[in-house]
Amino acid sequence: MESPFTYILITLFFSSILLSIIFFMTWQTMGKQKYALMFSLSFLASTVLWANSLFKSLFLSHELYWMIGCSVSMLSVVLGTWGHCLRTNTKIHPATLLGIGVFGMMLTYYFTYISPHLGLRMSLYLYVDVLLLMITSVVIIKHRTKSRPAEIGASLMHFIFAMCILVAASIALSQGREMDVELIKLYAIVNFTALPAAYVGMSVFVIYMLASDLAEEMKLLAMTDPLTDCFNRRGFYSHAKQKLLELQKQPQHACLIYWDIDKFKA
């Protein structure tokens, strides 16, 4: 009988395929925004990661299997962080994110092949993932003065996901140079219970966040004139009402300008 963990990996594999397709379709239909493509590629990399774990018995070398898995894991998070930086116009150069990933790969390679150390080999790439996820969490929440509910949820889920990975990494590191069977069991419990739930939750909130972006764009479109980018009657009324409510609290005069542009458009 297959291990219960195998069924979790199969579920994550197909979930990642679906999420990658969803974000690719989002990229196609939302003006080919680069961040949507980055999200699609991120989940595609996750698909490769789960496939790598499912078919690890096909590898002739366990070290090769491990290096591929670690590299794809970091690539997935790098692409996701890159996508969030593009969405929020955060001035973090992609080379910085790639550099963090490459540095993690080099350290993992060193402690896998050159100076074998099980604890460091199993934990270093996870610490890199934690760093990138924390960057993403901050980038999302700092994007606006007043964050939308979807952004708060997405930022929180990235933070929770990072904390779950941090716990798993710390358990792996505490083994030291040699394997500790009890710690490996604890690591597996965290890795296959908390992590999948946090991963799916994070994915759903990213979709919710993009849906919220689209809703705001549609709201703006409904309140502005497409030819002049000025507020239409509905937009003027809504914006003016909000401004008047704000200015009522301040001892100063307000001036509102309203004009009819129908003849101009004709």
Where do the protein language model's features map onto the residues?
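Amphipathic coiled-coil signal-transmission "stalk" helices
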Residues: 193, 200-203, 214, 221, ...
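Charged, elongated alpha-helical coiled-coil/linker "stalk" segments that transmit conformational signals
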Residues: 207-209, 213-220, 242, 246
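Conserved nucleotide-binding and Mg2+-coordinating catalytic segments in signaling enzymes
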Residues: 219-238, 259-265
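Active-site-proximal structural segments of metal-dependent nucleotidyl cyclase/transferase enzymes
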Residues: 239-266
